[in-house]
Amino acid sequence: MVSRRAFLAGSAGLAALPTLATLAACGESGTTFERMRASGVARIGIAGERPYGYLNGDGAVTGEAPTVARAVLADLGVGGIEAVQVPFARLLTGLLDGQYDLVAAGTTITPSRCARVAFSRPDFLAPLAFLVPEGNPQGLRTLGGASRSRTRLGVLEGSAEQDYALAAGVSPTAITTYDGQSTLYRAVANGEVPAAVLTRLSLLDEQSRNPGSRLQVTPGFAPSTTPTGEPVYPVGAFAFRPADTDLVVAFDTALTDLQTSGRWLETVRPFGFDDENLPPAGLTTAQLCTS
């Protein structure tokens, strides 16, 4: 996540990085990157969360993160991807257990996750929002407000939103966890919980597929890490095993090229992203892992 001050400050530009050709030639024998380049296929972990990473009606993997990953990996000489879908809460565990080579699911960078895995450079910014009944009867605008009103909230199990809610003072007993985006949506629709919190992009995508639900998505907001703290912007990225340093460096270089060339926006627009979701050029993963 990134503070509002850091977000507005941005940066003068991206640091110089090695060329893709140089990086591709440096893979050590036996590394994940070497195996991917030899086979031409990367295995990616997804959680079925729209619009980040999911399977379409034909069973093909799609979403913002797999599509960006496909473009980045193609620039690295890896032309194919195979998806493994697991529950959201098991994404990082599956990565560390070797089920796939990287996570392409719009995973939010947080210090606790940085202690387990290596993240790519920031891929996108994603403000949060509430899913509430029409008219927003609780008047929810922020997680601090939800805490003060003692509103019960639905969240995805193991999500950054769960951590944000707890940090904002929401009682653990007021939080109900769900294992999937659609299940979370139905919980509000069925009155199991009066509200849910998730990225606004996810909620708008779910809302578009549930016309007539009599629910609404609130305006986006930046959560705080404490009840009175400075707002922070959730930032999504790709996750890797810590030992796969050559893959992370190569992936970052290609992702940087994709973002600075304008191809990133062309790639993500079909999934509801726009230039407001593009991270500031100078925002680094190191900053996010310590904030």
Give residue spans per PLM region.
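A ligand-binding cleft/hinge motif common to bilobed small-molecule-binding domains
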Residues: 106-115, 166-167, 194-232
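Periplasmic-binding protein-like
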Residues: 125-131, 211-252, 275-291
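Short helix-initiation/N-cap motifs at beta->coil->alpha
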Residues: 83-93, 176-186, 190
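Flexible hinge/capping segments at coil-to-helix
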Residues: 33-35, 121, 133-152
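N-terminal secretory signal peptides and thylakoid transit peptides that target proteins
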Residues: 1-18
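Extracytoplasmic small-molecule ligand-binding "clamshell" domains
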Residues: 32-106, 115
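Extended ligand-binding regions for polar small-molecule ligands
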Residues: 27, 63-75, 136, 144, ...
